[in-house]
Amino acid sequence: MERFFNTAGPQKPDIHYTIDPLARFDLDDVLMLIRQQKYFVLHAPRQTGKTSCMLALCELLNRQGDYLAVYANVEAGQASRDNVENVIGSTCDTLAERFRQILKSDQPLEIRESTRSLKGDSMLAVFLQRLSEALPKPIVLIIDEIDALVGDSLISVL
């Protein structure tokens, strides 16, 4: 297939003209922030390769083996707007599925089920706590489209 320029979603080097997504930001600085267990934001205009950068970072971290890195897009929570419980539930479901895919195990889904009866933002906190206790490596969450959430929903997820 002939390669072409892509501005609609993650880059696929086999069919898109692309540059190394990890060369688009200071990788050493980002890895230092991760080692220091700090939060950080990758901010750039629309369709500039943020998702491709996040996916590449996730792949790199998993390949290095010190962390379990999981990429999740939480844009689906946008439809629930200020319904915090729906947004938190959707976020937990998304994360559980992404962890299941990476671990090739249903354990994240089972942990998610054990938190379904919890209310509010404690659901997400307890889900992540239980998941981190069950896993042998520290977790790095790479969350895309967090800015799609608004108001109390955004604050609760963060």
Tell me what each language-model feature is.
Residues 81-105:
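Conserved NTP-binding/hydrolysis module of P-loop NTPases
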